[in-house]
C-alpha cells in the first residue's frame, strides 16, 4: 500500500479515504461531522482558511486533519 502523502486533496476524495466502507455521500457527511465533533479541529481548520463549501483541501488543511484524525 502506498504511504499517505500530505498534498492537496479533493474534500470528497479525502473523506472516502477516511471512510472507505461508506458511499460517497455518507463519507462526506461523516467527515464533516468528525470535523465538528473532534475537539479543536473545526477552529484549526477555519484558521487554515477552510470554509463549509471548500472543495479542495490545501496541504496545510490536510496536515491539520492528519494531526487530529491520524492518517487515513
Predicted regions and their residues:
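Membrane-targeting and insertion segments and their boundary/processing signals
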Residues: 1-5, 9, 32-39
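Polyanion-binding surface elements
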Residues: 2-22
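Ca2+-coordinating acidic residues in Ca2+-binding motifs
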Residues: 13, 30, 61
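Major-groove DNA-recognition helix of helix-turn-helix-type DNA-binding domains
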Residues: 21-56
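A short, Lys/Arg-enriched interface patch at domain edges and termini
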Residues: 55-72
Amino acid at each position: 500500500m502506498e504511504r499517505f502523502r500530505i498534498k492537496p486533496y479533493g474534500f470528497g476524495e479525502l473523506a472516502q479515504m477516511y471512510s472507505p466502507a461508506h458511499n460517497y455521500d455518507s463519507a462526506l457527511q461523516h467527515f464533516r461531522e468528525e470535523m465538528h465533533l473532534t475537539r479543536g479541529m473545526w477552529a484549526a481548520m477555519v484558521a487554515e482558511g477552510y470554509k463549509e463549501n471548500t472543495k479542495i483541501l490545501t496541504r496545510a488543511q490536510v496536515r491539520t486533519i492528519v494531526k487530529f484524525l491520524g492518517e487515513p
